[in-house]
Amino acid sequence: MALWGGRFSQESSALFKLFNDSLPVDYRLVEEDIVGSIAWADAITGVGILSQQECQSLKQALQELLAEVKDQPETILASGAEDTHSFVEQALIAKVGDLGKKLHTGRSRNDQVATDLKLWCKKEGKALLELLAQLKAALLSLAERELDAVMPGYTHLQRAQPVAFGHWCLAYVEMFERDISRLQDCLQRLDTCPLGTGALAGTAYPMDRYALAKSLGFASPTLNSLDSVSDRDHVIELCSDAAISMMHLSRMAEDLIFFNSGEAGFIELDDQVTSGSSLMPQKKNPDALELIRGKTGRVYGSLMGILTTMKALPLAYNKDMQEDKEGLFDVMDSWSICLEMAALVLSGLKVNRENTLSAAQQGYANATELADYLVAKGMPFREAHHVVGEVVVEAIAQKKPIEEFELASLQVFASVIQEDVYQCLTIDSCLAKREALGGTSLTQVKAALAAKG
């Protein structure tokens, strides 16, 4: 039975019911709806709508229903109710009779769903903070495990300068720490309770909304009824936070997919996060990482979907806003599983140190060191840059690394070059000189690890 039938003389068409009903999506809010209803029972008791005995009867029935839906969630969808609010009210009436019809006094599904959704977002947001922390810990563990492994750093996907593998790990730690900060900010902003604002104009009953908000674990009540029931900023912000974090996950996945390729051979992924080919028996595919990269697109799509849905809605509530949940639920599910999977990938990852070191020694990654050496000898950097470019051209022609040139050959390009140049061209020297804060020297990487730990 619908909650709004008195105004209508005809039944809804079967097609409209299928089109209109939201239970197949919003059933995930049923626990929050019951918790909110328990708090509402106390609130309307405080203004004389319910007696203490009636309140206790309703709360007991709601607690029973909460246990039932946790134990047998399939009963929700089997009910045929229009939405999660209708399911709860119908189940309550089945338990306590006409008393159940009093619970909705002073309340609208508009403030009800806004409250349910915020409660759900708070719960899921806290779970995601834990997953982000676990991923950060996995990166720190990998950085410590492979602290002194050396690999080429890239710009334009070309070898640029040698870096410590731990430095690469710590770059993603920085990204995921920003994700944590953004999510914490979002959870702080959404921590206001809409319950008690009615359909749009506020409730007619003089209840203490501060006490109501506190009883549900919110920091405070919302302050404008029109905004309360039409606000979905928290949905947009969570989707945005997820999109940025998924971008970070996708970039990390792309790096690791390349590192894992036969062309690079820098790492080996554990069997438990890879799969094979139905035709080619030799294949070991990085499917976990590719799926992280692939799921990023659907998260972006959901963000654009809710932004587009909300962009032209007049105040206050509109049925369009029923479309806020499907995308949000998918975003949070996708973000969650990708964070878990990324941590699992990192936990079993092995670095092929010989390959990473060999790659770091190729591609003239020490060319910048030679330029810095010339600057130390008094040559202006722009001139030094040009001279080293000429050295690299000659090195490519001779198919040999810079450090294998004889001193006399190097002095053809710059007479200030002396025997001590060879000390500057080693991989160890390249790393050790990056001592400034945020650099890739082992001293800096160790300090960064200690600070993050």
Curated annotation (Swiss-Prot):
Keyword flag Lyase: yes
Pathway listed: Amino-acid biosynthesis; L-arginine biosynthesis; L-arginine from L-ornithine and carbamoyl phosphate: step 3/3
Membrane-crossing residue ranges in chain numbering: none
Superkingdom of origin organism: Bacteria
Reactions this protein catalyses: 2-(N(omega)-L-arginino)succinate = fumarate + L-arginine
GO biological process, one term: L-arginine biosynthetic process
Localization per record: Cytoplasm
GO terms under cellular component: cytosol
Entries under SUPFAM superfamilies matching the protein: L-aspartase-like (SSF48557)
InterPro entries for this protein: Arg_succ_lyase_C, Argininosuccinate_lyase, Fumarase/histidase_N, Fumarate_lyase_CS, Fumarate_lyase_fam, Fumarate_lyase_N, L-Aspartase-like
GO molecular function: argininosuccinate lyase activity
Signal peptide (residue range): none
EC number: 4.3.2.1
Keyword Amino-acid biosynthesis: yes
Record keywords: Amino-acid biosynthesis, Arginine biosynthesis, Cytoplasm, Lyase
HAMAP family assigned: Arg_succ_lyase
Protein family (similarity comment): Belongs to the lyase 1 family. Argininosuccinate lyase subfamily.
Name of this chain's protein: Argininosuccinate lyase
Native source organism of the sequence: Shewanella loihica (strain ATCC BAA-1088 / PV-4)
Species classification: Bacteria, Pseudomonadati, Pseudomonadota, Gammaproteobacteria, Alteromonadales
Gene name tied to this protein: argH
